[in-house]
Amino acid sequence: MPSVKVRENEPFEFALRRFKRTCEKAGVLAETRKREFYEKPTQERKRKAAAAVKRQLRRSSRDVTKRQRLY
């Protein structure tokens, strides 16, 4: 769990903003959303495989556009 020490003469809003930023960097909210509901192992594998395919398509389309722009 991320922690933030409030400095002297620091407004609460600034400390809260720093805390939110550290939580975002640590991935706390993403982890809680992921664990909110149980996901079967087969569903998890399907989701990860689909994400990998999508990532691969995105990378290959970037390479194609880079090759075409030879002007």
Swiss-Prot record:
Residues 45-59 have a biased composition (Basic residues). PROSITE patterns: RIBOSOMAL_S21. One of its GO terms (cellular component) is ribonucleoprotein complex. Residues 60-71 have a biased composition (Basic and acidic residues). It comes from the Bacteria. Belongs to the bacterial ribosomal protein bS21 family. This is Small ribosomal subunit protein bS21. It comes from Stenotrophomonas maltophilia (strain K279a).
